[in-house]
């Protein structure tokens, strides 16, 4: 089994998260994608909404998307949501699965600042989402890591080896640019605008019913 993992504050979850995840799932032929709300994000400010509210929004989205599941593993920890700790737990939970941690290229270029970042490759593959035509400069310190671990998507045409999941590779997927951000959505909602083009109806319905993000 091949499992994608997309973490985020999801404050709120929107099409800028969902559409790239769908594109990655299709490009790599993943069996499912776990959407994982951060509880205590180490690289961001604390979310506006509670963890319970963000879990609810993500659960609602997953209920409407085939092959997507809510992962609450970080929500159940009262420690910072370090990726390496999460992936170690997931590799124990899915011992025969190949894990694919999905991230933007904007996050990858700062990977060296992450907690025990080199150990991440022992538990999962990375999937880098990038805009078509964008490339990491040869001078960037992460370029060497990318070159050493880069793998072609075509290699996934072979079925995964049961009991011997392969980790440590980096796959790059060109995704359709999404000019959407949670900050923009929160700002719009605060002044009474309804960003119907950015949110799934089920998410917008929950936000309106709970009167969230109002100034």
Curated annotation (Swiss-Prot):
Listed pathway(s): Cofactor biosynthesis; NAD(+) biosynthesis; deamido-NAD(+) from nicotinate D-ribonucleotide: step 1/1
Keywords linked to the UniProt accession: ATP-binding, NAD, Nucleotide-binding, Nucleotidyltransferase, Pyridine nucleotide biosynthesis, Transferase
A GO MF term: ATP binding
Catalyzed chemical reaction(s): nicotinate beta-D-ribonucleotide + ATP + H(+) = deamido-NAD(+) + diphosphate
InterPro entries associated with the record: Cyt_trans-like, NadD/NMNAT, Rossmann-like_a/b/a_fold
EC supergroup of this enzyme: transferase
The keyword Transferase is assigned to this record: yes
GO BP terms: NAD biosynthetic process
This enzyme's EC code(s): 2.7.7.18
Family indicated by similarity: Belongs to the NadD family.
Record PANTHER family: NICOTINATE-NUCLEOTIDE ADENYLYLTRANSFERASE-RELATED (PTHR39321), PHOSPHOPANTETHEINE ADENYLYLTRANSFERASE (PTHR39321:SF3)
Function in brief: Catalyzes the reversible adenylation of nicotinate mononucleotide (NaMN) to nicotinic acid adenine dinucleotide (NaAD).
Name listed for the protein in its UniProt record: Probable nicotinate-nucleotide adenylyltransferase
